[in-house]
Amino acid sequence: VDTDAVLDLLRQTAIDVITPRFRALAEGEVFTKTHPGDLVTVADRESEEVITTALRRAYPDAMILGEEAASADPSLMRAFAAAEHSFTIDPIDGTYNFVHGKADHAVMVAELRSGEVVRSWIWQPEHQLAFVAEKGAGAYRNGERLPVLEPAADSTAWRGISSQAQIRDGSFEGLSPMTETWFCAGVDYSHLAAGDVDVIVFAHAKPWDHAPGMLLISEVGGVLQAGDGSTYNPAAPRPWLVGAASPTVAEGVRARMAGALVA
């Protein structure tokens, strides 16, 4: 299936399943998973089902890892780690935003071969923004190729964001204070790939949240590293991630935050 066809699948799923429920969720259509802020809706579940069915039809031998399926069956993570060919699906990234009527949500898919992300798609239905990347072929926003990022040399000029209050409230020598993310990895990574921010610090590392953005930023010169400096591995995710506009930015941030980026 060509890259445009997968993007069309995400767009159509949003039209059919996601957007009709935006700011229109009925009572009984929102559920709590692990804690009060960890939400899932009927739109998440139906969206994942539609995308999973389509990908399985196109790629019958591929392992499909959807967020909601993995939540229901944790053994799927082991199958994903062992798979030669796989896809991740985040049916609504930023569900909390979606439930609360905020436009910053996305539907995301990544394709992996032998554990390496080779294609990724991020569709933001309310913003009508598509971010697509292919390994070695660049990253694109609504069909236009994004330029290689050129972050400032001065670390105090790096624009950083984090979803974690302890990082935003922390004082790190040589770094300016970080501000809030958009609380949607698909939107966060898109802003990094577009050069709007230089670094993102995440606490959680689920593959469906980070595999799409990892390829997107790497195709414009960025990197996604674990807190210990190793390259992010979707099959064996560790807590704390630093997504940065360049290896230099990632290394600089990790060095200055070393004590904070521990599990």
Regions found by a protein language model. Name each.
Residues A58, L112-E116, E126, K135-G138, ...:
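Short loop segments at secondary-structure junctions
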Residues E150-A263:
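An extended, acidic
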Residues R45, E68, P91-G94, P125, ...:
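Generic detector of well-ordered alpha-helical packing
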Residues V118, L146-V148, Y232:
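Short, isolated positions in well-ordered beta-strands
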Residues F80-Y140:
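DPxDG-like acidic metal-binding loop motif
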Residues I18-R21, D44, L55, T95, ...:
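Residue-level signal for inorganic ion chemistry
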Residues V1-I92:
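N-terminal subdomain of lithium-sensitive/metallo-dependent phosphomonoesterases centered on the IMPase/IPPase/PAP
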